Amino acid sequence: MNSVNKLLEKSFKSNWDRPAISNYRGATITYGQLSYNIVATHIMFEKCGIKPGDKISICSKNQANWGVAFLASLTYGAVPVPILNEFKSGTIHHLVNHSNSRLLYVGEAIWENLSPSEMPEVEAIAQMENFSVLYAKDSELKRDRLNIDAIMQERYGDSFGPDSLCFYEDSPEELALINYTSGTSGFSKGVMIPYRALYSNIKFGSYAMPSLNNRSRVVS
């Protein structure tokens, strides 16, 4: 199995009831709850017309929902674009545009200094802390977000579980994510990272740190 997303799918299914991610001194969600949030986010991507290969920018401080947004983007086949939350608004506007991002996840404090008009290709902007829709070209999107649990119920009924997962199957040379440098000399440079690089890191990590398992805790 050389697909990163299929490795994630297998892991989520195998650890469904185990804790997955937490906020520091905050709530913890299981892999099952994480999967629910990811699939619900995939539905919102569909509503926005997002397709595999489209770029999704993520700009906020570290928090559990950052992981949800990143994993949802990756497992949908979209290309996550992490942006440092310390950047000034002009730099964030530039990187969102430079990456041709169609969606933006943003922290509440950062949003106060951003302007959708400066990012004309962006279809929607969501607040990272609660995934509420801050801006959308399609006026129906805010309503869909408010009704996402009902939409999930309509699609899956009461049977949402491990068998409901079917993540996008990536190929080794396919673009996985765009990682921008800190921009010490002028604007940041975007590094295009293929899935084979992620896959190699996963395999090397399991070899180099054999004691790391599904009971280990990792600080990010």
Describe each PLM feature range.
Residues 1-20, 36:
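A short N-terminal helical cap/helix-turn-helix that marks the beginning
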Residues 16-17, 127, 143-146, 150-180, ...:
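Conserved pre-ATP/AMP-binding loop-to-beta segment of ANL
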Residues 17-49, 54-63, 67-71, 88-93, ...:
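Conserved AMP-binding/adenylate-forming core of the ANL superfamily
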Residues 30-32, 167-168, 176-203:
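Conserved AMP-binding A3 loop
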Residues 35-41, 172, 191-213:
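Conserved structural elements of the adenylate-forming
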Residues 55, 61-81, 85-89, 97-103, ...:
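A short helix-loop-beta submotif of the ANL/AMP-binding
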Residues 60, 83-84, 122-137:
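Short beta-strand elements of ligand-binding domains
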Residues 87-117, 201-219:
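Conserved ATP-dependent adenylate/AMP-binding module captured primarily in the ANL superfamily
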